Amino acid sequence: MSEKEGMSEELEDTISQFRKESRSQSVKEPGFIKETSNLINEASDYLEGKSSNQIYETHPRQITLESTSSSGSKSKRNEEQKKNLQFSETSTRTETSQSLSSLTGRIAEYQALVNFLSHETVGEVSPQVSEENQKHLGLETTCKDNFTVNLEAKGLQEFPKDILKIKYVKHLYLDKNQIKTFQGADSGDLLGLEILSLQENGLSSLPSEIQLLHNLRILNVSHNHISHIPKEISQLGNIRQLFFYNNYIENFPSDLECLGNLEILSLGKNKLRHIPDTLPSLKYLRVLNLEYNQLTIFPKALCFLPKLISLDLTGNLISSLPKEIRELKNLETLLLDHNKLTFLAVEIFQLLKIKELQLADNKLEVISHKIENFRELRILILDKNLLKNIPEKICCCAMLECLTLSDNKLTELPKNIHKLNNLRKLHVNRNNMVKITDSISHLNNICSLEFSGNIIAGIPIEIKNCQKIIKIELNYNKIMYFPLGLCALDSLYYLSVNGNYISEIPADISFSKQLLHLELSENKLLIFSEHFCSLINLKYLDLGKNQIKKIPASISNMISLHVLILCCNKFETFPRELCTLENLRVLDLSENQLQKISSDICNLKRIQKLNFSSNQFIHFPIELCQLQSLEQLNISQIKGRKLTRLPGELSNMTQLKELDISNNAIREIPRNIGELRNLVSLHAYNNQISYIPPSLLSLNDLQQLNLSGNNLTALPSAIYNLFSLKEINFDDNPLLRPPMEICKGKQLYTIARYLQRADERDEKILEKIFKIVANNITETNFEFLCQKLNLANSETDMPTKSTVSLSERAHQALVIWKTQSNKLSLTAAALRDQLIRALTMIGAYEIMDKITALNLFTRAIKF
């Protein structure tokens, strides 16, 4: 095989591996790619009718291993890479497919580089292992050469010795285990390794023996606790890729300069402050990640890496660029977001191959007209700077596809912006734009347009010429009339015009049959327009914060509607017309004036989420209990009439996962709440609840419990049964057991441990009280006490009464009473209080004095 072919194969592995690391690192992919991909995927999901409802998992999903041959694994990776070059699969709608095809083709050129920042599961291929060991490790063998072993998240605490003794193992993935050292790994067993990945293991160092791995091409020890790289790493002459992302490295490992074949180096998210001048010895380095370190200057050494194509310096403290940056002749991607740049050195505009330049969140006030040199530029991110204008010369960047200028001080765009014929994404949110220029209409390939947070009063009718546009956001401007030009956009599926002054909807919107997502909240709408009802493909409609009072019967035509938001309107009665929406999943009628719910709501067979918070219900609307599909219910009343009780029928909603009954005047939780087996979240704060029913403690999937601001004085000891609980809050309760300071940390273990010890203590105190009563009670008071404790004579009479002392009989009677009371789930503390009340009623004051003394003594002892 030629050297060129070998390099190509290694670079292919490089791309695949860098994907794996970068996804686990949560490295952001370029905004244009990510957002546009999400946008198109969302459209695809809409068209395919996919649900986006949240899925709750109480227990982590089990990870299984698959086995294929090495060549099969490589074929699989190649196939997946090809898939990743596409933004989405062909849509079921011809129109959408046509509008997206050009987008896909244009971006394919640099999508391979972007794919460095997206993770793929590495092919899991198993080595030759005995059938017994295969069964034990969950491995299978399908070939006899070039094996990959993937033991990710298997709970391993040391290297799997049996696997290492197999000479054919070449690729070993041990990510997400607890392997903290190389102890137990015989370096001789590792000699054949070409890829070793130990991400997320808690490693604090690398052993010097790593120098023996002469065949190693890829080493990934990202997401560990490594602070030092041993000098022996310089002996890895064949290494192509090194990943040390998210560790504690403070000094750049100078020994890396000996790794002449290194192509990818990731040292992002460490504590580096300096880069050595010897770095240029890495003459084959193509990708360098130094994001989120502590670099205060742009290291000049970086400028002399002749083959560098991607450089990430995001999240440092760099305030200027050196003139030597012009030497990076092959650089295609430069990421400098979140730094301290106040200007750009003019030499940066000599990087003629640059395709992606990200400069968001700096302090740039001006962009040089020399930007015209960037003839290959595809992506330009300039959000969150101090720019007041963009030079006209930007229109010489003929290949530009993504331009984002949000959060600056722009008042207008370049007059000849229409020359950017390839522009697909233009975002100018939160600036000082007064109008959208007519020249926008000549951007024939534009797909995503955002001008939210400006002072725009109208949209030019010529926008109708942008027939490939699929998403528009115009939120929080000064628009008074619905832009008619938008109604002529055949590919528009997402439109958001929240926070404007629109009071009427034109009939022309009826022609926007392709529209899937429409937001018009915080406008001046007085009615639910009949024209909305012609949008038969619409899935999401937000008309919240308007002044709508009723719903037209023709809403039944909106057969695709999944989400309907009508919060903060003027509804006084529940609109029965909504009950014809058989496909509705989410309905928000919060902050209206509803007093009751129609029984027709049972027709919403697919409803999953309801928000009726802050209304005027006289009673809990029991009609809701018919909804078998409901997963989330919010009936909190921070602004509405307070509910005082919950019906037992609440338990009929067996699919319920989230319940919010906060800010009411509810006195008790239904005793059968334990029948809501799927409940994950219960918010009942700011009520008058004084007791937690035992059945609540059987909710095994419960993860969130908020009972703050109630009247709880004690927590049940069995609260530890809620083993899935992750978030708890008992603040602002008059708690005595446990005391409030124990609950402030919101740690279930601390609370449960206290209650366990308190139970043990209360049991001992109760037994001592039994002895005090038995040793001091009179025959007459004993009979009265039995009556007060509801103990029948048959339970206290003994066959040998003449020979059994009063003390023994009294103690036996109290034990019987305790046994009976335990059936009612009464705690030892509650039994003690009940017994004291009974003794007070029969006038056993001498005994009471002794018990009081005992209580005072025990309270003085801290436990």
UniProtKB/Swiss-Prot annotation:
<dbReference type="GO" id="GO:0007165">
    <property type="term" value="P:signal transduction"/>
</dbReference>
<feature type="repeat" description="LRR 23">
    <location>
        <begin position="654"/>
        <end position="676"/>
    </location>
</feature>
<keyword id="KW-0433">Leucine-rich repeat</keyword>
<keyword id="KW-0677">Repeat</keyword>
<feature type="repeat" description="LRR 15">
    <location>
        <begin position="468"/>
        <end position="489"/>
    </location>
</feature>
<dbReference type="Pfam" id="PF13855">
    <property type="entry name" value="LRR_8"/>
</dbReference>
<feature type="repeat" description="LRR 7">
    <location>
        <begin position="284"/>
        <end position="305"/>
    </location>
</feature>
<feature type="repeat" description="LRR 12">
    <location>
        <begin position="398"/>
        <end position="420"/>
    </location>
</feature>
<feature type="repeat" description="LRR 14">
    <location>
        <begin position="445"/>
        <end position="466"/>
    </location>
</feature>
<dbReference type="InterPro" id="IPR011029">
    <property type="entry name" value="DEATH-like_dom_sf"/>
</dbReference>
<feature type="repeat" description="LRR 21">
    <location>
        <begin position="606"/>
        <end position="627"/>
    </location>
</feature>
<feature type="repeat" description="LRR 27">
    <location>
        <begin position="856"/>
        <end position="863"/>
    </location>
</feature>
<dbReference type="Pfam" id="PF00560">
    <property type="entry name" value="LRR_1"/>
</dbReference>
<dbReference type="Pfam" id="PF23598">
    <property type="entry name" value="LRR_14"/>
</dbReference>
<feature type="repeat" description="LRR 26">
    <location>
        <begin position="724"/>
        <end position="745"/>
    </location>
</feature>
<dbReference type="InterPro" id="IPR055414">
    <property type="entry name" value="LRR_R13L4/SHOC2-like"/>
</dbReference>
<feature type="compositionally biased region" description="Low complexity">
    <location>
        <begin position="88"/>
        <end position="100"/>
    </location>
</feature>
<feature type="repeat" description="LRR 18">
    <location>
        <begin position="536"/>
        <end position="558"/>
    </location>
</feature>
<feature type="repeat" description="LRR 5">
    <location>
        <begin position="238"/>
        <end position="259"/>
    </location>
</feature>
<feature type="repeat" description="LRR 17">
    <location>
        <begin position="515"/>
        <end position="535"/>
    </location>
</feature>
<feature type="repeat" description="LRR 13">
    <location>
        <begin position="422"/>
        <end position="443"/>
    </location>
</feature>
<feature type="region of interest" description="Disordered">
    <location>
        <begin position="51"/>
        <end position="100"/>
    </location>
</feature>
<dbReference type="InterPro" id="IPR003591">
    <property type="entry name" value="Leu-rich_rpt_typical-subtyp"/>
</dbReference>
<dbReference type="Pfam" id="PF24978">
    <property type="entry name" value="Death_Lrrd1"/>
</dbReference>
<feature type="repeat" description="LRR 25">
    <location>
        <begin position="700"/>
        <end position="722"/>
    </location>
</feature>
<feature type="repeat" description="LRR 1">
    <location>
        <begin position="143"/>
        <end position="166"/>
    </location>
</feature>
<feature type="region of interest" description="Disordered">
    <location>
        <begin position="1"/>
        <end position="37"/>
    </location>
</feature>
<feature type="repeat" description="LRR 10">
    <location>
        <begin position="353"/>
        <end position="374"/>
    </location>
</feature>
<dbReference type="InterPro" id="IPR032675">
    <property type="entry name" value="LRR_dom_sf"/>
</dbReference>
<feature type="repeat" description="LRR 3">
    <location>
        <begin position="190"/>
        <end position="213"/>
    </location>
</feature>
<protein>
    <recommendedName>
        <fullName>Leucine-rich repeat and death domain-containing protein 1</fullName>
    </recommendedName>
</protein>
<feature type="repeat" description="LRR 4">
    <location>
        <begin position="214"/>
        <end position="236"/>
    </location>
</feature>
<feature type="repeat" description="LRR 19">
    <location>
        <begin position="560"/>
        <end position="581"/>
    </location>
</feature>
<dbReference type="InterPro" id="IPR000488">
    <property type="entry name" value="Death_dom"/>
</dbReference>
<feature type="repeat" description="LRR 22">
    <location>
        <begin position="630"/>
        <end position="653"/>
    </location>
</feature>
<dbReference type="GO" id="GO:0005737">
    <property type="term" value="C:cytoplasm"/>
</dbReference>
<feature type="repeat" description="LRR 6">
    <location>
        <begin position="260"/>
        <end position="282"/>
    </location>
</feature>
<feature type="domain" description="Death">
    <location>
        <begin position="767"/>
        <end position="855"/>
    </location>
</feature>
<dbReference type="InterPro" id="IPR056869">
    <property type="entry name" value="DD_LRRD1"/>
</dbReference>
<feature type="repeat" description="LRR 16">
    <location>
        <begin position="490"/>
        <end position="513"/>
    </location>
</feature>
<feature type="repeat" description="LRR 2">
    <location>
        <begin position="167"/>
        <end position="189"/>
    </location>
</feature>
<feature type="repeat" description="LRR 20">
    <location>
        <begin position="582"/>
        <end position="604"/>
    </location>
</feature>
